Amino acid sequence: MTVEEFFDQVITVRMREDRSSLDIIDQTLLPGTIKRINLNTKEEIWEAIKKLRVRGAPAIGAAAAYGIALLASGIAGDQYDAFYSRFKELKDYLASSRPTAVNLFWALNRMEAAVTANKERDVTAIKELLFEEADKIREEDIQISRGIGEIGFGLLKELKKEGREIGILTHCNAGTLATAKYGTATAPMYIALE
């Protein structure tokens, strides 16, 4: 199995191509079972964050961004004020799932900023923009993790050249399942494999 094939199997958070649901790995079943679940409702998304079905700050942020985009796509009507009012209710509801999750609030606030910065646009365009913003959040996380990996791999190569013993010690949730891809502390190993 190549590194890319591995990543395809363990993408923690992704939106289904048809945008009908948020697709996550249910991390409460790990390590014994890798099971993907689809989240369609505000209750399912809230519960997945609350019950740690999705774990790791970056992964929670991506789940929140995709979750609010999915929920906003179902808001009826084409009047901005009514749309924004309902968006805020949904945002606040998702935010209540994990009161200490910094990336949860960061992602939801960023999504809200995208809505308010585009209030002159029609609601359909704003809904599309929210999916694009969620994609950006996920892609930025991938690039951050990759950057960590490249720097870390460079340091590991230097240690190896010096003949020093190499070890990687992680704490908390620092692997690929905590992020959109690569992980944080584990990223240098994946970059090395690439």
Model-based region annotation:
Residues 1-43, 47:
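Positively charged, low-complexity intrinsically disordered leader regions
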Residues 53-63, 67-194:
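N-terminal active-site beta-alpha-beta segment that forms phosphate/nucleotide-binding
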